[in-house]
Every structure is written in C-alpha cells, then in structure tokens.
Amino acid sequence: YLKHYKRPAKKSYKTEKALVIRGEMFPREYFGIMHGYLHLPDVKRVAKQYGVTVNQYLLGVFAWSVYKGYMHSIPHRRPLAVCVPVNLRPYYGSNTTKNFFAVVSAMFRAEREDYTFEEVLAQVAESLKSQITKEHLEEIMAYNVSNEKNKALRATPLFIKNIAMKIIYQMSAKANSGCVTNLGLVKLASPYDAYVESLYATLSMSKNQNLKAAVVSYKDTLVFTFSSAVREVDVQKVFFRKLSEDGIDVSVETNGVYYE
C-alpha cells in the first residue's frame, strides 16, 4: 500500500447503516454452510446474455435473492449493501503474495415492491462499475494510508488505538449487510491438479453480517459457498432456483447443521 500511495485523501468516506439479515440464530459455535456447484461455462454464458461480468451477475442474483427471499419484495429504508473485496494487483502490476485489496459495496435500494431481476441486476452492476475504477480505488487506498501516516495517530498509545479500532470495525460492519468475495480461477500445478475436482472457500461471521458467500472457480466448476449464522435458508433457495431458471445446472450440498 505504501509503495503505491500517491497523495493524501481529499475527504473521508460517509457510510449509512445497511439492512441486517436476521432470523433464528445458530448457537454461537455453529454456522451453516451451503455449497452450490455450477458449470463455469454456463455461468459465463448467462452473464454474457445479461451483458454483465460473472461477478456482477452473481452479486445481482445474491441481491435478488435477499430482495425476494428475505425482504419479500417489501421496500426498506435501509439499503442492501454487499461488501466486495477488489484485488488491486492488476491495477498496479503487482505480484505480491501479501494482502493487497480494497473494499467496495454492491448496493441495491428497495424502494418499491415490483422490481424485476433485470432492474435489481442493473442497480448492482452500476454501483460496482462506478466504484471499481483505478481513480476511486486510489482514493480509498490514499484515505487508508493517510491515517497510517498521521503523526498524531502514530503517537497515540496502543491501548487507545485498540479501543478505537474495535469501534471503527463495528461501525464499518454495520455499513454492509453481508460479504461476497470471488477468489477467481484457481490453478494447481501438475500432478496435483489431476486429483482435485473442485475447490471452495468459506467466510466466518461478522457483527450484523449474518449471511456471506465465497466464490472459487477451478477448471470448469464454480463453487458458490454460503456461510450463514441463521437457520432460515430462504435466500439460498431463491439464489439457486434463479440460477437454475437461467439454465445453469446446480448441485447443492451442506454441512448438515440445517437438519439438526
């Protein structure tokens, strides 16, 4: 981050509280896992038909599923905001193995009851397009690094920083309803690749973010993995049903906690 830091941030970023997905909670030490195995070429084909990228399509289906499965098409004063990590390496020609990413939010505001999927997808895709530009990502990075360079903050005792960071984390967590991260296409070296059919990742829970997802593609299989702190699976059902309606073959498995 310091290497590519260019200028102090001109302004801070304002956030608003996002919709919280609530329900019957699992015990603290449990959370539900649901894998959806998809044929990657089919996902690419469908995304192209809608005129969006694979990531935009999956996030659009995620937003649609929350709108139909959780909100039941009812308008809400708070937006659905989905945290989306963005890999910064392609923007700076970096091959670092350290964490090098910025975070944006895919937004959908439910202001009426009759949105079509195409309208939800358009909102989500446009919110991502407006944020995932090198200029905007540089602003985010500059803001974060400028705080690190602030002499007054650097002189602050560690115990005060720890308290402040906890408060800031809780506030930032409230700005998102959940998170969807796409690790992209993963390749394994020979001869190991011959023994692996698919790969997946799971995200742990955060305060006020009770539903998250991780996406991993390997060969011709894309695995979309939900992790959830709530027992209800209405959102997941709508999600995989929509993919199936769009002509994508879906195979689903869980970690079994939904049946206990």
Question: What is each model feature region?
Answer:
Residues 19, 23, 32-38, 44-46, ...:
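Acyl-thioester-dependent acyl-group transfer interface
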Residues 1-52:
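Flexible, P/S/T/G-rich "lid" or insertion loops adjacent to the active sites of thioester-utilizing
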